[in-house]
C-alpha cells in the first residue's frame, strides 16, 4: 500500500474535497471549503519526496523532473480516484489531491434543474460549463455525460488532463484520452478526435486559441462539444471565446457561436448554512433567438438582462440563483452578498443575516 493512502483515507473520512501535502507544512484537508490541519507534524522535504515519488510512474516522473510540476491521476481501488498536481516550491515539494467519486453522480443526485437535463438531449452544438477552480465543473460535466451515456447509442470521447471520472459503457462507446499520456495537447487530441466518428466530445479545458477554434468548428460540423472555461458568468464566457480570435475573425466567430452554442452553465460552490456542506449556485443561459441575436451583433453587455428575462425557458442569473438559495435558507445573506455581482440587491438580506 502506498504511504499516501493513509492521509487520503483520513481526509475522505472527513468528507474533504482536497488534501494538501506540502513539505515544510502540516498535512491539511479542505473540508466544506475550509482548509484545516489533520496532522500536526511538519512534513520534511525527504518525507514528502519519498511519498509523492512513490505514486508517480516513469512518464509522470520524467515530466516532473523536466518541468517541476505535473498533473496526473491516482486511485485507491474500491475507494476513490484523485486528481493530483505535484509541484516544487520554496521549501521543497508538494502535491494537492482532489477527490473524485469512484462513479459519476447523476443529475438527480446533484439536484440539477430540468433545463440541465434538457441540454443533455442535444445532439450537436456546444455546451459550456464554467467557473473558477473547485467550483464543481467536472462533477457537473460528468453527470451530463452519464445522462447521455444512458440515453444515446453513439460514441462519447473525452479529452482530459488528467482523466477524472472513469465512465463505463452503457448505451454508448466511451473513449477517454489523457493529455500527456495519450496525446501531447488538448488541440492535438481534439484534432484527432474529429477523425474518430464521435457523437459527443468533452474537452476538459478550452485554454488556447487552437483548441477553441477546433471545438467551435466541430460544433458547426454537427458534433456535440462540451467544454469548460475558467470564466465567471455566461457573458464573460462568450466574450473570452470571441476575443481569443484575431480581430479580423471575430465577426465570423460571433456568427458561428450564435448558431452553434446551446447553453452556458456558470457555477460556484458556497458553504451551506442549514447543514455542513456546500451547494452550487448556477447561472444558466440558453441560446434562445434573443440571445443568439445579441451574440451575433456583439451586444454582450445585454446578455445579463436577457438572462434575467428568460426564466420561462429555464434561464437564471447568478444573482437570481444566489437569492433563491438565501430564500430557501441554504446559504446566509452575507455569503450571497460576497459572491453577488450586484451587491446592492443583497444589502437587505445581508443586514438581516448579520442581526
What are these regions (language model features)?
Residues 1-355:
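Short, flexible helix-loop junctions that flank or precede catalytic/ligand sites
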Amino acid at each position: 500500500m502506498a504511504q499516501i493512502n493513509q492521509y487520503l483515507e483520513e481526509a475522505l473520512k472527513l468528507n474533504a474535497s482536497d488534501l494538501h501535502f506540502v513539505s515544510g507544512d502540516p498535512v491539511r484537508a479542505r473540508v466544506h471549503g475550509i482548509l484545516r490541519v489533520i496532522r500536526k507534524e511538519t512534513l520534511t522535504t525527504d518525507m514528502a519526496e519519498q511519498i509523492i515519488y512513490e505514486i508517480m510512474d516513469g512518464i509522470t516522473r520524467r515530466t516532473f523532473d523536466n518541468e517541476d510540476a505535473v498533473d496526473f491521476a491516482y486511485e485507491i481501488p474500491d475507494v476513490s480516484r484523485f486528481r493530483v498536481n505535484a509541484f516544487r516550491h520554496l521549501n521543497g515539494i508538494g502535491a494537492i489531491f482532489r477527490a473524485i467519486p469512484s462513479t459519476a453522480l447523476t443529475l438527480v443526485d446533484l439536484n440539477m434543474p430540468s433545463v440541465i437535463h434538457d441540454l443533455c438531449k442535444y445532439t450537436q452544438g456546444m455546451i459550456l460549463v464554467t467557473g473558477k477552480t473547485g467550483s464543481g465543473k467536472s462533477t457537473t460535466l460528468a453527470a451530463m455525460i452519464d445522462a447521455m451515456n444512458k440515453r444515446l447509442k453513439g460514441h462519447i470521447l473525452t479529452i482530459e488532463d488528467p482523466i477524472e471520472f472513469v465512465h463505463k459503457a452503457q448505451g454508448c462507446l466511451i473513449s477517454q484520452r489523457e493529455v500527456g499520456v495519450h496525446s501531447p495537447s488538448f488541440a492535438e487530441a481534439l484534432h484527432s478526435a474529429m477523425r474518430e466518428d464521435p457523437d459527443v466530445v468533452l474537452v476538459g479545458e478550452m485554454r488556447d486559441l487552437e483548441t477553441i477554434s477546433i471545438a467551435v468548428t466541430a460544433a458547426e460540423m454537427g458534433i456535440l462539444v462540451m467544454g469548460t472555461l475558467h470564466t465567471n458568468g455566461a457573458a464573460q464566457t462568450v466574450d473570452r471565446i470571441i476575443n481569443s480570435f484575431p480581430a479580423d475573425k471575430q465577426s465570423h466567430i460571433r456568427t458561428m457561436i450564435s448558431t452553434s452554442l446551446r447553453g452556458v452553465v456558470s457555477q460556484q460552490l458556497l458553504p451551506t448554512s442549514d447543514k455542513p456542506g456546500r451547494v452550487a449556485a448556477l447561472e444558466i443561459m440558453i441560446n434562445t433567438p434573443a440571445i443568439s441575436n445579441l451574440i451575433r451583433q456583439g451586444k454582450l453587455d445585454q446578455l445579463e438582462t436577457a438572462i434575467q428575462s428568460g426564466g420561462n425557458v429555464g434561464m437564471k442569473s447568478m444573482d437570481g440563483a444566489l437569492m433563491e438559495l438565501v430564500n430557501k435558507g441554504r446559504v446566509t445573506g452575507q455569503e450571497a452578498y460576497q459572491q453577488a455581482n450586484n451587491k446592492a440587491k443583497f444589502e437587505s438580506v445581508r443586514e438581516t443575516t448579520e442581526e
